[in-house]
């Protein structure tokens, strides 16, 4: 039976097909003859309390000049789709939040939404670590109060400060004690004490890499991508010039990943990417985890295949349970 798969993502015209994780998943889905319905956030709507979206049938190919075609525009009931992948990148703004409510209605009507809409809405990727796994994180302060941030710097001498809603290494600053730019950075980050941000002690092991570990259906993948900063940089993100080094998970990585995985499963988070620097957990990415292609290329193991095998297994379970 053909699986009807919906995907909500940023414009497909703007992706880098050599790196994009959604593209890798879609390519495998197409190989399995899934019918793929392409959507952007703006396409979703509720009518008479029923969830719909304007969609286009998506066909893709591994060609960097022309990698997609969109056909047969039509509005569909989200409840008629077997599975919907919510792969829209942050920020988690009002439009994103409203979309999760629409998806939640489709979920109530039987659609399988990855990841669970209420979890996408409830668990900030940086706060999630502090509220659920404080034993694994660096020294952390979340506040908009400039005096408290100044005192945190005094205590730890060398810190990282970043927005709670950011991604891809954007707006991340390293501040050392007596840095002449400290006050202006804090003013900028907190928007003059109106928006909280997260401060953590600087971890020197960042120079060995910020490790992205993928967890699929409650099972950690045994290889990770260590994203190593370029010279004179504190951020390892590939999008800003860091380079990737695929590694086997260390004993500490396994301990953290196996501790986190059951909670993710319980909360309907089918696919996540956790970030570890040294021995410390820094983020749990649940909106649109990346690094599939980089790890696949280095290991020869198709993560996309593992994802869709598990997705299909879960779909079968859901259908069986529905008829019990």
UniProtKB/Swiss-Prot annotation:
Which positions are annotated as binding ATP? 152-209
Obligatory cofactor(s): Mg(2+); Mn(2+)
Task: Please name the PROSITE patterns in this protein's record.
Answer: ATP_GRASP
Q: What is its EC number?
A: 6.3.2.3
- Cofactor mode of binding and number, as noted: Binds 1 Mg(2+) or Mn(2+) ion per subunit.
Q: Which GO terms describe its molecular function?
A: ATP binding; glutathione synthase activity; metal ion binding
Instruction: Please give the SUPFAM superfamilies that the UniProt record associates with this protein.
Output: Glutathione synthetase ATP-binding domain-like (SSF56059), PreATP-grasp domain (SSF52440)
InterPro entries named among the record's database cross-references: ATP-grasp (IPR011761), ATP_grasp_subdomain_1 (IPR013815), Glut_synth_pro (IPR006284), GSHS_ATP-bd (IPR004218), GSHS_N (IPR004215), PreATP-grasp_dom_sf (IPR016185)
Positions annotated to bind Mg(2+): 283, 285
Pathway(s) where this gene product acts: Sulfur metabolism; glutathione biosynthesis; glutathione from L-cysteine and L-glutamate: step 2/2
Q: Where is the ATP-grasp domain?
A: 125-312
- Keywords from the UniProt entry: ATP-binding, Glutathione biosynthesis, Ligase, Magnesium, Manganese, Metal-binding, Nucleotide-binding
Q: Which GO terms describe its cellular component?
A: cytoplasm
Catalytic activities? gamma-L-glutamyl-L-cysteine + glycine + ATP = glutathione + ADP + phosphate + H(+)
UniProt cross-references to HAMAP family, sorted A to Z: GSH_S
The UniProt entry, under PANTHER family, shows: GLUTATHIONE SYNTHETASE (PTHR21621:SF4), RIBOSOMAL PROTEIN S6 MODIFICATION PROTEIN (PTHR21621)
Family indicated by similarity? Belongs to the prokaryotic GSH synthase family.
Name this polypeptide is given: Glutathione synthetase
- Record organism: Buchnera aphidicola subsp. Baizongia pistaciae (strain Bp)
- Lineage, top ranks: Bacteria, Pseudomonadati, Pseudomonadota, Gammaproteobacteria, Enterobacterales
- Please state the gene responsible for encoding this protein: gshB
């Amino acid at each position: 039976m053909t699986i009807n798969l919906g995907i909500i993502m940023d414009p497909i015209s703007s992706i880098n097909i050599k790196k994009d994780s959604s593209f890798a998943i879609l390519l495998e889905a197409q190989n399995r003859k899934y019918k793929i319905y392409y959507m952007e956030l703006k396409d979703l709507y509720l009518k008479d309390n029923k969830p719909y979206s304007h969609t286009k049938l998506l066909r893709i190919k591994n060609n960097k000049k022309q990698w997609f075609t969109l056909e047969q525009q039509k509005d569909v009931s989200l409840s008629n789709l077997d599975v919907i992948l919510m792969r829209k990148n942050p920020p988690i703004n009002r439009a994103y939040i409203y979309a999760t409510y629409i998806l939640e209605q489709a979920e109530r009507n039987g659609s399988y939404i990855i990841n669970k809409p209420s979890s996408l809405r409830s668990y900030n990727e940086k706060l999630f670590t502090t509220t659920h796994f404080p034993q694994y994180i660096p020294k952390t302060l979340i506040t908009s109060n400039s005096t408290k941030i100044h005192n945190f710097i005094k205590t730890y001498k060398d810190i990282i400060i970043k927005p709670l809603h950011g991604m891809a290494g954007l707006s991340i600053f390293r501040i050392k004690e007596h840095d002449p730019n400290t006050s202006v950075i804090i003013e900028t980050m907190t928007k003059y004490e109106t928006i909280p941000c997260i401060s953590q002690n600087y971890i020197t092991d960042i120079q060995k890499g910020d490790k992205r570990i993928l967890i699929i259906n409650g099972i950690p993948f045994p290889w990770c991508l260590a994203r190593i900063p370029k010279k004179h940089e504190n951020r390892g993100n590939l999008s800003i010039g860091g380079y990737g080094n695929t590694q086997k998970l260390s004993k500490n990585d396994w301990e953290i990943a196996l501790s986190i995985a059951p909670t993710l499963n319980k909360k309907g988070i089918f696919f996540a990417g956790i970030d570890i620097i040294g021995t410390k957990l820094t983020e749990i990415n649940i909106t649109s985890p990346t690094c599939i292609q980089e790890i696949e290329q280095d290991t020869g193991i198709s993560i996309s295949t593992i994802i869709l095998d598990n997705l299909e297994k879960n779909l079968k379970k859901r259908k069986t349970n529905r008829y019990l």
